[in-house]
């Protein structure tokens, strides 16, 4: 007897729109431009920002362990003076920039900057403990350390995405009592200029997860350390936040210690044999990180990088006429200690001098941009509208409202006080910047484009690797041959005789 199959039938998933590469609808031209910033400098306090008496920021926090996120603004190529007006048809095409080369210049010497805490929660040296010492009421000590070593460069046309662990919420009706361990939640957010990098203590919100303010050094005790979410950016559908990235990290443990305090989760009794007297010491172990030696042999900066193929679907197209360049360089984190005389005495006294500390940074950004065209067919416009509608709005494309058949009123004496005001009182809505609430280092390159690539260091490197030659400027002029005079010809004739 025939019986139907009892196996489940799996239907194919519903088809979805396919994300295509920008190479399928963007046509690249042979026109390149060089753009560079001026020397970018930053000076501030490496541990915290110094406030004035009126609660205004006097000295900003500038640390070698902060992210530098540059928002580079580019000119609109559709309003750009082109060498060849017949390059594109403005009625059916639009121009966009493609980033093909970048070099991040870093000034200042190599060096390591220390950080620390005058009251760090350090109970014992658990690596070489001389004796079993119990915890007192306050065992905090003055400890300094160097951090994990990081070099990072991320390029995209949207801000980079970071991740960190923060305090989460329990499901109802569960409640969190005082002193209970808070639940953890992985949070994604934009990496902004000035955010702290992972220094070796984890990517987390130290302000809410370490309420003692003595577990980590001063510069991160009330801050959030973020780590780039490479997995999320690599899986992004359109690939706008991550064209490519360069990364180098290294760290080792310098000192081992344990934390003072009441153990919230004591060691189970079946894991050890009890002592004859006394209680167990703290079992919360931690370590101070170190990035070890810095050397010029392992530098990712002050070198050109050429973008041939991006890791995502966006192959370097700068949507919105902007790029976001994220930089981290802890190999130049030296802190400058300054000393000022408060009062002059004949003998040396520590109180006669005031000590200060500063950190300085120096950058130079250079780019090579390629001019590209997009033919605005119906399919391309529909695809771009689904990807980012603001792109078409910037190109002055909008939906035409349908013609209305209703009867409208038109007054003759518009300025008369006998009728109501006929003006539209609602002000025109300005275009809202989607990143206005975030903090970035804005670099305006709208007036710094040049087609003379051979006049700039990165431009000459680009011409060399691309096998191109610069346009000759000085051509040798050939002198015309001197015309023979009649007198000279007669002299030659007499000589022959």
Swiss-Prot record:
Compositional bias segments (type: Basic residues): 488-497
Keywords: Capsid protein, Disulfide bond, Host nucleus, Host-virus interaction, Late protein, T=7 icosahedral capsid protein, Viral attachment to host cell, Viral penetration into host cytoplasm, Virion, Virus endocytosis by host, Virus entry into host cell
Region (Disordered): 473-497
Keyword flag Ribonucleoprotein: no
Subcellular locations according to the entry: Virion; Host nucleus
One of the Pfam families matching this protein, by short name: Late_protein_L1
Gene Ontology molecular function: any one: structural molecule activity
Protein's GO biological process: endocytosis involved in viral entry into host cell; virion attachment to host cell
Cellular-component GO terms for this entry: host cell nucleus; T=7 icosahedral viral capsid
UniProt-listed InterPro entries: Capsid_L1_Papillomavir (IPR002210), Capsid_L1_sf_Papillomavir (IPR036973), dsDNA_vir_gr_I_capsid (IPR011222)
Function noted in UniProt: Forms an icosahedral capsid with a T=7 symmetry and a 50 nm diameter. The capsid is composed of 72 pentamers linked to each other by disulfide bonds and associated with L2 proteins. Binds to heparan sulfate proteoglycans on cell surface of basal layer keratinocytes to provide initial virion attachment. This binding mediates a conformational change in the virus capsid that facilitates efficient infection. The virion enters the host cell via endocytosis. During virus trafficking, L1 protein dissociates from the viral DNA and the genomic DNA is released to the host nucleus.
Family from the record: Belongs to the papillomaviridae L1 protein family.
Assembly and binders: Self-assembles into homopentamers. The capsid has an icosahedral symmetry and consists of 72 capsomers, with each capsomer being a pentamer of L1. Interacts with the minor capsid protein L2; this interaction is necessary for viral genome encapsidation. Interacts with protein E2; this interaction enhances E2-dependent replication and transcription activation.
Name assigned to this protein: Major capsid protein L1
């Amino acid at each position: 007897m025939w019986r139907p199959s009892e196996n489940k039938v799996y239907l194919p998933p519903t088809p979805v729109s396919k994300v295509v590469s920008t190479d399928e609808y963007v046509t690249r031209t042979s026109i390149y431009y060089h753009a560079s910033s001026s020397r970018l400098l930053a000076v501030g306090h490496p541990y915290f920002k110094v406030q004035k008496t009126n609660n205004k920021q006097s000295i900003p926090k500038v640390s070698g362990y902060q992210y530098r996120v540059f928002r580079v603004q580019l000119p609109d190529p559709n309003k750009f003076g082109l060498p060849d007006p017949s390059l594109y048809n403005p009625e059916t095409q639009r121009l966009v920039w493609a980033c093909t080369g970048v070099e991040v210049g870093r000034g200042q010497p190599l060096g390591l900057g220390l950080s620390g805490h005058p009251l760090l929660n350090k109970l014992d040296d658990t690596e070489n403990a001389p004796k079993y010492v119990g915890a007192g009421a306050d065992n905090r000590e003055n400890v300094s350390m160097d951090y994990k070593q990081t070099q990072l460069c991320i390029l995209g046309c949207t801000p980079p995405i970071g991740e960190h662990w923060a305090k989460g919420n329990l499901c109802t009706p569960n409640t969190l009592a005082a002193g209970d361990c808070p639940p953890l939640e992985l949070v994604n957010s934009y990496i902004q200029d000035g955010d702290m990098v992972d220094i070796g203590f984890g990517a987390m919100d130290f302000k809410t997860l370490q309420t003692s303010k003595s577990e980590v050094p001063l510069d991160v005790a009330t801050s959030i350390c973020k780590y780039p979410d490479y997995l999320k950016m690599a899986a992004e559908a359109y690939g706008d936040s991550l064209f490519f990235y360069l990364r180098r990290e290294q760290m080792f443990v310098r000192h081992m210690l344990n934390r003072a305090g009441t153990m919230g989760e004591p060691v189970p009794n079946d894991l050890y044999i009890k002592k004859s007297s006394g209680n167990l010491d703290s079992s919360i172990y931690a370590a101070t990180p170190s990035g070890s030696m810095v050397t010029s042999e392992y530098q990712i900066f002050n070198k050109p990088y050429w973008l041939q193929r991006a890791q995502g679907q966006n192959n370097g197209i700068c949507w919105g006429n902007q790029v976001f360049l994220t930089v981290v360089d802890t190999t130049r984190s030296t802190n400058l200690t300054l000393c000022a005389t408060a009062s002059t005495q004949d003998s040396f006294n520590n109180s006669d001098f005031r000590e200060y500390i500063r950190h300085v940074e120096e950058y130079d950004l250079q780019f090579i941009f390629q001019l590209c065209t997009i033919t605005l067919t119906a399919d391309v416009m529909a695809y771009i509208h689904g990807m980012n509608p603001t792109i078409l709005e910037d190109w002055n494309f909008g939906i035409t409202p349908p013609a209305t058949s209703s009867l409208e009123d038109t007054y003759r004496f518009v300025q008369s006080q006998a009728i109501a005001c006929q003006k539209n009182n609602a002000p025109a809505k300005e275009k809202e910047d989607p990143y206005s609430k975030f903090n970035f280092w804005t670099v305006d390159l709208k007036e710094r484009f040049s087609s003379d690539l051979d006049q700039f260091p990165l431009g000459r490197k680009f011409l060399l690797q691309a096998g191109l030659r610069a346009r000759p400027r000085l051509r040798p002029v050939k002198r015309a041959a001197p015309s023979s005079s009649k007198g000279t010809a007669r002299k030659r004739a007499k000589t022959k005789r």
